Amino acid sequence: MTSAWEEIDEWGPEKVLQVYDPDTGMKGVLVIDNTSTGPGKGGIRFAQSVTPLEIFRLARTMTWKCAAAGLPFGGAKGGIIADPNIVDRVSWMKSFAKMIRPYCPSQYIAATDVGTTELDMAIFAHEIGDMRACTGKPSELGGIPHELGTTGYGVSVALQTALNILKELKITHLPQRTQTRVVIQGFGNVG
């Protein structure tokens, strides 16, 4: 079995925090993979199955995603190890935020991920004391509502761009747009 520490290379991670709060029982992980282009950006997973190795790998993925998109962010990822439907999610989120506060938002900017919601991000930002500490907040706190379909719109733009490139390269015969069907697998914002 691969150890999280075997994932270290010249690109990162720069910081790895494993935190535990004896008052709540909260166990969490924060991996700040690379901040060469800006603070590490990545969601907070809240699930019983979270492992340090998973968070290492997801943080690296965020490094490459932000770099590929030309964003002024590096990569990072957070994880809280518990079923959010069983534990007191508010106290656990507050505890996680409190323990990683020194890194937010200068080195880490959180977001929603598996098991976290807009309300979790509101709790996180309030506990950090800085609304810039995360994205994915409710609209009342300056967030963009999911109902606007920003993620789905991004998928649509990416698909249209890919089709235009294929057409320009004359790689394949493309049917008329009205004859085209697309299948997207997944759940949540994208699916």
Range-by-range predicted roles:
Residues V182-I184:
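Hydrophobic Val/Ile/Leu positions in short beta-strands of Rossmann-like dinucleotide-binding domains
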